[in-house]
Amino acid sequence: MSWTREDMVRRAAAELRDGDVVNLGIGLPTEVANFVPPEIAVTLHSENGLLGMGPFPDEDHVDPQIINAGKQTVTMLPGASTFDSALSFAMIRGGHVDLAVLGGLEVACNGDLANWTVPGKLITGMGGAMDLAAGARRVVVLQTHVAKDGGAKLVSRLTLPVTALGCVRRVITELGVFDAAGDHFVCVERAPGVEPAEIERTTGARVVFAVSRRRPEPEDG
Amino acid sequence: MSEGGARGKAGAPAGGKVRPDAGTALDGLRDGMTILSGGFGLCGIAEHCIAEIARRGVRNLTVVSNNCGNQGQGLAILLKTRQIRKVVCSFVGGNPDLADQYLAGTVEVELSPQGTLAERIRAGGAGLGGFYTPTGVGTIVADGKEAREIDGRRYVLERPLRGDFAIVRAAVGDRMGNLRFYRTARSFNPLMAMAARITVAEVDKLVDAGALDPDDVHLPGIFVHRIFEAREHKNAVEFRTTREAGSRA
């Protein structure tokens, strides 16, 4: 039994450290905000120009001019600040953002990331993905272990266009947690009931299993 | 142009910077010009300026903007009217008008990573010849660009962007052109304002000089050449997400 999407998001939230400034990518990573451990404080950065982003507003407090980088309406927490896009990306490239949790299409075991385009599909543009991948102090990717067609997404070498080189520290999938270690991945956790053989079969690079025991179940709440 | 030169006057001339509406504020806009447009998606865009550009029907425009509108609104209006020849942006997702015309080959798209786009515009306004950024190293963005290693890290040279007109939106502006923005409607607006020969500011509220405290000015009036008040805006929301609907936080 592998992790559910919520389990994956909870596991990604366990990567947050007290005092971190965190940028959450569009899609599944955005949901990490809902599972910040109560004993720590993190500050959410949105690259369109907001530090101290809060949750979605309630129906009575929607402000069309307070949005996140996914163009969703959000709120600002006490102590928030707003700024222009150049300053926002100075924060990112300048190494002031501690952690970026991003979606992925492919991650190579040397840390290379592809997450912005698939040739032949409709172009979407990289938005802030290249800046975040190249600039955040630590990059964690949250993605499914294999593509919809069953192809490996953890690979020895990227086949898709690069977002940034050597940037990914850790990948969280429904099968476990994997660290980029140069010429192989290190599996540091396995989801409950997932055997090493299944991981080896579905991974396009060598995997070294650092632990035989899986991490305890994430707690509810 | 009414300023009588290649660029707008940065100081407030005797006739003033204030214009009655977008129509007069965009005097001198011609076919083939480059327009820098502030905002992020549909947030913080100069709606009245965009409507006026559509009304004028000028063509073969190059538009520099993080997104070229979305969901048929904002700058996508100028795609529908086939007035745009080239778009410089970071993101085209959710914009069927742009996707269709790009695939048909009628609109050229130059993609720039969002932070690189912002800094290119800032560099244009700040008089810089470009800058070295780590963003895009090893990607198609770096193709054909000078790369170099500085203190052990690899960088790619990105060039500045400038425009003929900038259309920006601010919450408050005074007669000197000083601007104050609101929330995340700021985004690209102050940057675009810096990098154009003629910057037109569309403000929700126009006040007298002195009404804005100097310490509260986000963008000094030196970057703004024409200003007009527009009280009504659509302020369209692309994704209305609320606590009940989308989050348990």
Identify the residue ranges that each predicted region occupies.
Chain B
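Conserved alpha/beta enzyme-core scaffold
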Residues: 2-249
